[in-house]
């Protein structure tokens, strides 16, 4: 039992409880007529008597509000909210999926609020606490003034929830989606409620009777109907609310169907307009957006009207606010939206694509008439007949053909222009590449020309130097020949022949050595050439001085040979002459080496492009030819001697003996020469290997030391030039003295001897050999090259004389 103000809660009679329970169990809640049930319950309640009518408690205000209830409201709210059955009983959808809950057995009657409500602060133009409004969105909050269940059911209007005047609609207006008039009948009047102040009324009360659904206007039911409705049990009120919600859902479905039909009609009109129009069109505004805007405006109006006119049930609140939609309806709306969006996008894209395709087709069709057909002789002959003129205007066809030809001309010109640009770029690249190649080839040619010019200049210089040397040596030989008497000519021929043989051997050796060293690079040859040039300059200088000094000697010779004091001077200067001989022999040995190196360098330059194997073969072939020639000559001489032995023996016995000795000597020489050649060939091979290694080293060091060597060689050549000049003067003087001595001894021998001129000529080789042994080596080196030339002529004369003998 709950208490309120010390008054006990009246229990239902047993027959009422049994009747209600039997009624609930007999019928299905979905098929119950809740209005008839409520009328029956009210009639039974009135028949049971008005025992529950009690006077108001002393703490009532003039407007029917209980002060003690207002004070105890929050406490009761807190206590009641802690109950475990509270949340289960007061769910927002408690009447949708299950039967209304039965009253508890211990607490027989518990009238709930019409819906979860919340007190809203008063409006601006109301100063009293009685003008509270229900917020439409806060539906799940329980009213704090709805828990005072201390009074009887008939006086339940005295509670703080029923503090407003229902007739004037300050907080609860007449139900707009409410019950039909026959469901509620006027009952006995209850206690009159005090009138409400006008300042507590909202100013826009009469203007806010709006709703999106047009319903018949009903008269305001009396206050008794509202009070009776509040006194109904919870399960009957739940049934009534359920019935109202079902009606609202039906109305909403009808409205949605109308909207859908309107949308479909608008879509059809839009598609018809799009098909009728030509060309691309801009995307039209979506119709669904405008409908949503209209719905938003209606919902705002409904919310504003819902704040003013309220019913005790939550059904009218849902009508004024946005209607709650089921999941199926939401899915259906989403499908509609997606369809609309997709169709709009598809239409836009297809319109653009169709426009571009049509444009391309039109452009191609205008290009279709070719020039050949427009200008062909067949068409000209057909048009000349006159029968085709009536089928169409020729001017339009000509214009079309001209347009097509112009467009085709422009396209062809563009293509040609592009092709020309590409060809020009390609040609430019080719020209650049060719220019680069030509430049490279020219540079290579210039380098080769420079190298060849340098080589030619070098060879020319060497040839000039050799010619100068030969001229100087020829002058020396001529001077020496003039010094000698004509009687010494046959004695001189023999040593010249011997010099020839030696020179040939030396030439073959130098050829082989030069062939072995021909594989060396141009750097070594250039270095040797620089050395040779310096030596040539020094030798030329010495030859000039010698030629100058020889002229006064000629004048002094007869006086020296005739006068006896000259002999004393010679004997005195022998020691001095020996010293001079040693020095001159050294200098001449150096000159020989330099000449040999010069000759070898010249041969290397001539044989650069030749391989060493070819040079070796040629040198060997030359040596073989020389051997064969010598052997053939010796055989021919032997045959001649054998053919005429008797004629030669009579009167020329001494000559045969001399020739036999000479042949024996030649054979011995040839044998010794062969042995020497073999040894020298071996030594050359070794030297070649050594030279190759040296050349590799010298090539590395030559780059850095070539310049320094050139400077040093120039300085040495200048020094040697001065020294050789002084030495050559001394040597020439000494030679002239020796020649005078030899001439004197020869004259004495000739006068004393009684032999014939033939013996003297036959014995001349032996005497010449003895003289040759006495001669120093440096005197031979001077007359080697010129003796070859003059010796050839003398040998020919000697051979002719020997044959005639």
Curated annotation (Swiss-Prot):
Highest taxon in the source lineage: Eukaryota
Bias (Gly residues) ranges: 384-393
Biased composition (Low complexity): 509-550, 754-767
Pro residues bias locations: 100-115, 183-194
InterPro entries from the UniProt entry: PNISR
Record keywords, A-Z: Coiled coil, Isopeptide bond, Nucleus, Phosphoprotein, Ubl conjugation
Gene Ontology cellular-component annotations: nuclear speck
Phosphoserine: residues bearing it: 204, 211, 290, 304, 313, 321, 465, 467, 726
Stretches for region Disordered: 75-331, 382-805
One Pfam family it belongs to: PNISR
Ranges annotated as biased composition (Basic and acidic residues): 197-210, 238-258, 421-463, 473-486, 494-508, 659-721, 732-753
UniProt feature coiled coil, ranges: 237-276, 427-461
Residue stretches spanning the membrane: none
Polar residues bias spans: 75-88
Regions of compositional bias (Acidic residues) in chain numbering: 290-299
Subcellular location as annotated: Nucleus speckle
Basic residues compositional bias, start-end: 551-560, 567-579, 587-598, 607-639, 771-781, 789-805
Cross-link (Glycyl lysine isopeptide (Lys-Gly) (interchain with G-Cter in SUMO2)) at residue(s): 218, 496, 703
Sites bearing Phosphothreonine, chain numbering: 485
UniProt similarity note: Belongs to the splicing factor SR family.
Subunit text: Interacts with PNN.
Protein name: Arginine/serine-rich protein PNISR
The organism of origin for this protein: Mus musculus (Mouse)
């Amino acid at each position: 039992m709950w208490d309120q103000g010390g008054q006990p809660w009246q229990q239902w009679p047993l027959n009422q409880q049994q009747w209600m329970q039997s009624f609930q169990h007999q019928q299905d809640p979905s098929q119950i007529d809740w209005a008839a049930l409520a009328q029956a319950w009210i009639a039974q309640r009135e028949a049971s008597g008005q025992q529950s009518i009690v006077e108001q408690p002393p703490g009532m205000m003039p407007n029917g509000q209980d002060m003690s209830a207002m004070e105890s409201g929050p406490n009761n709210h807190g206590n009641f909210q802690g109950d475990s059955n509270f949340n289960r009983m007061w769910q927002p959808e408690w009447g949708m999926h299950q039967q209304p809950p039965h009253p508890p057995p211990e607490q027989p009657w518990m009238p709930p609020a019409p819906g979860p409500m919340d007190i809203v602060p008063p409006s601006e133009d109301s100063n009293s606490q009685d003008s509270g409004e229900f917020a439409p969105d806060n539906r799940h909050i329980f009213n704090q003034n709805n828990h005072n269940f201390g009074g009887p059911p008939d006086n339940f209007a005295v509670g703080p929830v029923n503090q407003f005047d229902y007739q004037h609609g300050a907080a609860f207006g007449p139900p707009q989606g409410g019950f039909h008039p026959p469901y509620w009948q006027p009952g006995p009047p209850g206690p009159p409620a005090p009138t409400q102040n006008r300042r507590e009324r909202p100013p826009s009360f009469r203007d806010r009777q709006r709703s999106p659904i047009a319903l018949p206007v009903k008269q305001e039911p009396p206050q008794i109907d509202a009070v009776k409705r509040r006194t109904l049990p919870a399960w009957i009120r739940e049934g009534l609310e359920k019935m109202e919600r079902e009606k609202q859902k039906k109305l909403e479905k009808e409205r949605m169907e109308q909207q859908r039909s309107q949308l479909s009609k608008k879509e059809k009109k839009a598609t018809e307009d799009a098909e009728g129009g030509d060309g691309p069109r801009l995307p039209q505004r979506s119709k669904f957006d405008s409908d949503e805007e209209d719905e938003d405006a209606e919902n705002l109006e409904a919310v504003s009207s819902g704040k003013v006119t309220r019913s005790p049930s939550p059904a009218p609140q849902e009508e004024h606010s946005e209607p709650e939609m089921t999941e199926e309806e939401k899915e259906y709306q989403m499908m509609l939206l997606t369809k609309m969006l997709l169709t709009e996008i598809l239409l836009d894209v297809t319109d653009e694509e169709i426009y571009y395709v049509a444009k391309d087709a039109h452009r191609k069709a205008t290009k279709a008439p070719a020039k050949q057909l427009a200008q062909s002789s067949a068409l000209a002959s057909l048009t000349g007949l006159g029968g085709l003129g009536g089928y169409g205007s020729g001017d339009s066809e000509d214009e079309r053909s001209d347009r097509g030809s112009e467009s085709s001309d422009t396209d062809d010109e563009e293509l040609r222009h592009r092709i020309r640009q590409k060809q020009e770029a390609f040609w430019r690249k080719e020209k650049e590449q060719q220019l680069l190649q030509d430049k490279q080839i020219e540079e290579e040619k210039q380098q080769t020309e420079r190298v060849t010019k340098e080589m030619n200049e070098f060879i020319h210089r060497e040839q000039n130097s050799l010619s100068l040397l030969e001229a100087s040596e020829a002058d020396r030989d001529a001077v020496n020949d003039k010094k000698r008497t004509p009687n010494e000519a046959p004695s001189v021929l023999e040593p010249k022949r011997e010099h020839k043989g030696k020179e040939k051997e030396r030439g073959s050796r130098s050829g082989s050595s030069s062939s072995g060293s021909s594989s060396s690079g141009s750097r070594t040859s250039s270095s040797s050439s620089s050395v040779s040039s310096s030596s040539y300059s020094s030798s030329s200088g010495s030859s000039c001085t010698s030629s100058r000094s020889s002229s006064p000697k000629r004048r002094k010779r007869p006086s020296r040979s005739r006068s006896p004091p000259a002999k004393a001077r010679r004997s005195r200067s022998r020691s001095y002459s020996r010293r001079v001989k040693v020095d001159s022999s050294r200098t001449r040995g150096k000159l020989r080496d330099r000449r040999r190196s010069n000759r070898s360098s010249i041969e290397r330059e001539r044989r650069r492009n030749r391989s060493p194997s070819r040079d070796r073969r040629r040198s060997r072939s030359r040596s073989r030819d020389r051997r064969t020639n010598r052997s053939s000559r010796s055989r021919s001489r032997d045959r001649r001697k054998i053919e005429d032995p008797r004629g030669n023996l009579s009167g020329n016995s001494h000559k045969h003996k001399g020739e036999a000795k000479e042949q024996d000597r030649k054979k011995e020489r040839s044998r010794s020469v062969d042995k020497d050649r073999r040894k020298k060939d071996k030594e050359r091979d070794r030297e070649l290997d050594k030279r190759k290694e040296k050349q590799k080293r010298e090539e590395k060091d030559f780059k850095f030391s070539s310049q320094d060597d050139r400077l040093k060689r120039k300085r040495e050549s200048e020094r040697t030039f001065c020294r050789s000049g002084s030495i050559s003067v001394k040597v020439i003087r000494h030679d002239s003295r020796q020649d005078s001595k030899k001439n004197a001894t020869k004259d004495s021998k000739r006068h004393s001897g009684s032999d014939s001129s033939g013996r003297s000529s036959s014995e001349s080789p032996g005497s010449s050999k003895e003289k040759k042994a006495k001669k120093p080596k440096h005197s031979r080196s001077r007359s080697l090259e010129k003796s070859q030339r003059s010796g050839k002529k003398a040998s020919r004369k000697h051979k002719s004389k020997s044959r005639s003998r």
